[in-house]
A protein has these predicted regions:
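Nucleotidyltransferase catalytic core that binds NTPs
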Residues: 1-71
Length: 71
């Protein structure tokens, strides 16, 4: 059985730092992303750069990610 790594964040926008983090986390196990919702990003940044569904689609299609959950 593989280890499970749970990461959370806004990923708005997705950038190379996220890619490096996912590559490093993949050495530990399979990755599940808890993706911050648009309301959280609005409180933090004023408004999201990309919608939750856009961010979830991008992050969910990354090589090491097995699931994306709303947070």
């Amino acid at each position: 059985m593989k280890n499970l790594v749970i990461l959370s964040g806004g990923f708005d926008p997705v950038h190379m730092g996220h890619v490096y983090m996912l590559e490093a986390a993949s050495l530990i196990g399979e990755i599940v992303i808890c993706l911050n919702n648009d309301d959280w990003l609005t409180r933090k940044k004023g408004k999201p750069f990309m919608s939750w569904i856009e961010r979830a689609t991008i992050v969910g299609n990354m090589k090491y990610v097995i699931d994306v959950l709303p947070m």
